């Protein structure tokens, strides 16, 4: 996603490029320190039981404004790739959404414990990255 954005002239700051844990607060603070215009956090969802749920969901502080528009655009693109669109939902209690000084979106790209989502994720990875990047580009 980042390289696609950079190819389109967007300056990208990564809070994490290795598999070393950083707390949500640390990530939010890094975004604030670099003065980012937007904060996008990309994750895989999980459920209590395997194959219980399927789809993409984006989380925002509230459903109004720039973050919500970006979340809707990202979800629409991921739906075109083949994910079930579970919608844009408010989660004002999440640190990366309530501690950033800029519009923030947390994207849950399918369920990591759902076979269908994993198959889609693996087989269409580049299209997924493009859909997320396009959703961001449409919103900035």
Regions found by a protein language model. Name each.
Residues 1-140:
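Active-site-proximal helix/loop segments of hydrolytic enzymes
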